[in-house]
A protein has these predicted regions:
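Active-site neighborhoods and metal-handling regions in enzymes and metal-associated proteins
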Residues: 1-298
Length: 298
C-alpha cells in the first residue's frame, strides 16, 4: 500500500474539476450541429465551466477534420460547423488542479473512425493501473485502432496533469513502446487516443490562437506590459486564448511578447496527409488497485 491520501484536498479538487468537465463536455457536444457557430460553442462551454465553479484550464479546442489539437476560435470567428468530423477538447481547473477530456462529434459520416478512438480509450482504461508500464497502455490503444483498419497518431500522447501544469510526466503513448514510465498510485493522467485514416503523424500548421507564459520579464512597451500582467494574474502558467485578452491591441502585444520569448504559441496540429482525426480522452487518478475516472459522464 502507498501512503497517498486519496481524500486530500488535492484529489477532491481534481474530482470536482472532473465532475464539472463531464457535464460541460456532454452538453457542449449536444450543441455541435451543422450551421452552429464554433465561437458560440466555445464561449458557451467556457462560461458554463465558470458558472459551475471551475475555470477553463485551457481554451476550448474545436478541431475540424484533419486538425488534431490547438485549434480554438478567433475573437470574431464566424466559422460554422458543416458536415465534418469535430473534436472537442476541454479542460477545467479548480484552484490549479486539473481535469482534461475530449470527444469526437461526427457530422461527416465517418462513424467507424470515431468509434475506434472511443473503443481504444475503453481498452486503455481496462489496462491502466498502478505498476503498469505506459507502453502496455499504448499497445492496447494501437491494437484496437489498427483492428478498425486505421492508425493511431503516434506523435501525440496522453500526459500527466500537475498543479497549474497541463502537461507533465508521464507521457502515455498511443502505440506500443518499450521501457516506458510506470504508473504509480496518486498519479493524475489524461489518457488520449487519437485515430486517423492517414499515416498517423501530425505536423504544425501556421495558425496560432493559443499561447502560454514562458517566463516572467520586464517589458517596456506599455500595452505588452498590461497584457503580460493579465496573463500572469489570470492564467499563470496555463494556456490562454488570444480572444481572452482585454486589450484591443492584444495581437500586437502578443507578437512582442513572443519576440522576447516571454510567451510561446501553440500552432494548430494537423494530420500530415490531410486525413481525418478522431479523439477520445478521460482523466484518471491512479489508485491502489486500478484507476478512478474523474471525467466520466454522471
Amino acid at each position: 500500500m502507498s501512503d497517498v491520501d486519496f481524500e486530500s484536498e488535492q484529489y477532491e479538487k481534481c474530482r470536482e474539476a472532473g465532475e464539472i468537465l463531464a457535464q460541460v463536455r456532454d452538453e457542449a457536444a449536444e450543441r455541435v450541429e451543422v450551421g452552429v457557430s464554433h465561437l458560440e460553442v466555445a464561449e458557451w462551454a467556457e462560461a458554463k465551466i465558470r458558472e459551475l465553479g471551475g475555470e477553463p484550464a485551457f481554451p476550448v479546442n474545436i478541431s475540424i477534420d484533419e486538425e488534431a489539437a490547438h485549434a480554438t476560435p478567433e475573437r470574431d470567428d464566424d466559422s460554422t460547423f458543416g458536415e465534418e468530423m469535430v473534436n472537442l477538447d476541454i479542460g477545467v481547473h479548480v484552484d490549479g488542479w486539473l481535469a482534461d477530456t475530449a470527444v469526437t462529434v461526427d457530422l461527416s459520416g465517418h462513424d467507424e473512425l470515431a468509434a475506434a478512438s472511443e473503443e481504444a480509450l475503453d481498452a486503455a482504461l481496462d489496462v491502466a493501473g498502478p505498476g503498469v508500464d505506459v507502453g502496455q497502455i499504448g499497445a492496447a490503444v494501437e491494437e484496437v485502432i489498427e483492428g478498425y483498419g486505421f492508425n493511431p497518431v503516434v506523435n501525440l500522447t496522453g500526459h500527466g496533469l500537475g498543479h497549474w501544469e497541463q502537461h507533465t510526466a508521464p507521457n502515455i503513448p498511443n502505440r506500443e513502446v518499450s521501457q516506458g514510465a510506470t504508473l504509480e498510485p496518486g498519479d493524475v493522467v489524461a489518457i488520449e487516443p487519437f485515430a486517423t485514416d492517414g499515416r498517423g503523424k501530425v505536423q504544425e500548421g501556421s495558425d496560432e490562437e493559443i499561447f502560454a507564459l514562458e517566463r516572467e520579464a520586464t517589458v517596456r512597451d506599455r500595452t505588452a506590459r498590461q497584457v503580460l500582467e493579465q496573463i500572469t494574474e489570470e492564467f499563470k502558467t496555463l494556456p490562454f486564448a488570444a480572444r481572452w485578452l482585454d486589450s484591443p491591441r492584444a495581437t500586437m502585444a502578443l507578437r512582442r511578447l513572443k519576440q522576447q520569448d516571454v510567451v510561446h504559441g501553440y500552432p494548430v496540429l494537423k494530420e500530415q496527409d490531410g486525413k481525418f482525426v478522431s479523439q477520445k480522452e478521460h482523466t484518471v487518478i491512479v489508485t491502489e488497485d486500478g484507476v478512478e475516472v474523474t471525467t466520466r459522464s454522471r
